Amino acid sequence: MWVGVISLFPEMFRSVTDFGVTGQAVKKGLLSIETWNPRDFTHDKHRTVDDRPYGGGPGMLMMVQPLRDAIHAAKQASPGKTKVIYLSPQGRKLDQQGVEELATNENLLLICGRYEGVDERIIQSEVDEEWSIGDFVMTGGEIPAMTLIDSVSRFVPGVLGDFASAEEDSFANGLLDCPHYTRPEVLDGKEVPEVLMSGNHKEIRRWRLKQSLGRTWQRRPELLENLALTDEQEQLLAEFIQETHHKRK
C-alpha cells in the first residue's frame, strides 16, 4: 500500500514510519509512506502557508496555492489511482467498517488540515472523501491521519504476523474483544479461566465468543443493536447475562 501525506509537520510521521508494526511494514516494503510539505511550494521568503478568511472571523485558513501545488505533486508521485482524503471534523466518523473499506485501496493521499481548515473549493475539487476520528476538535489532521494509517495498514497482507489478529480484534466482527491472559496462571490471587488451559479448541472458541458478546453488552450495548446475531450468539449472550445476574446475587 502507498500512502501520501500532505502536512505542515511531516516530521510527526516518523512515529509511523520508524516504529512498531507500521515501521516494520515500511522496512519490508509492504507499506510506503511519503510526505509533502506545503511550505516547500511557497514563493515568498517567509514561506507563508496561511491566509485570512473572507468574511472575517477568528483564525486563519491554509493558503490555497501552496496546498494545491502540494496535492498535485503528491498525485503525480502516486503509483496509481489514488483516493484523496481530507481529515476533518465534518467527515464520516472512522469505524472498523470504514477502516476495512479504506484498506481496499492500494493508494491513499491524506490531507492534514491546520489552522481553521482549508478553502471549501479545494475540498470540492481535490478531495474524494472526508473522514473524522471523532466528535472533538484537534489542532491539526496529523494525529487523525496517523490513526487512519495505523488501522488501515493492519489489513495489508503480510503486515501482521498472523492475519487472524486483525480479524479477531475488537470491532472486527462488530463486537468488543474478549479478555486475554498470559503467564503466570495465578496473579494476585486471580486465576486464568480453566477453559483456556484445557486444550479444547471448540470450548475455547465458545468461551471467547461468549465473553466478547458479554463485554459488548456491558460496555457498548448500542453495538448489538446493529448486529443480526446467530442462534449460537443469542444463546451465548443469554448465558452470559444469566451468569452475570447470578454472580450479583
UniProtKB/Swiss-Prot annotation:
Organism: Vibrio vulnificus (strain YJ016)
Record's subunit section: Homodimer.
UniProt-annotated location(s): Cytoplasm
Superkingdom of source: Bacteria
EC number: 2.1.1.228
Taxonomic lineage: Bacteria, Pseudomonadati, Pseudomonadota, Gammaproteobacteria, Vibrionales
Statement: the UniProt record of this protein carries the keyword Ligase: no
Annotated residues for binding of S-adenosyl-L-methionine: G113, I133, G134, D135, F136, V137, M138
Protein family: Belongs to the RNA methyltransferase TrmD family.
Main location: cytoplasm
Functional description taken from the UniProt entry: Specifically methylates guanosine-37 in various tRNAs.
UniProt-listed InterPro entries: Alpha/beta_knot_MTases, tRNA_m1G_MeTrfase_C_sf, tRNA_m1G_MeTrfase_TrmD, tRNA_m1G_MTases_N, tRNA_MeTrfase_TRMD/TRM10
GO cellular component, one term: cytosol
GO molecular function, one term: tRNA (guanine(37)-N1)-methyltransferase activity
Protein name from the UniProt record: tRNA (guanine-N(1)-)-methyltransferase
NCBIfam families associated with the record: PRK00026.1, trmD
Known catalytic reactions: guanosine(37) in tRNA + S-adenosyl-L-methionine = N(1)-methylguanosine(37) in tRNA + S-adenosyl-L-homocysteine + H(+)
Keyword entries, A-Z: Cytoplasm, Methyltransferase, S-adenosyl-L-methionine, Transferase, tRNA processing
GO BP of this protein: tRNA N1-guanine methylation
PANTHER family: TRNA (GUANINE-N(1)-)-METHYLTRANSFERASE
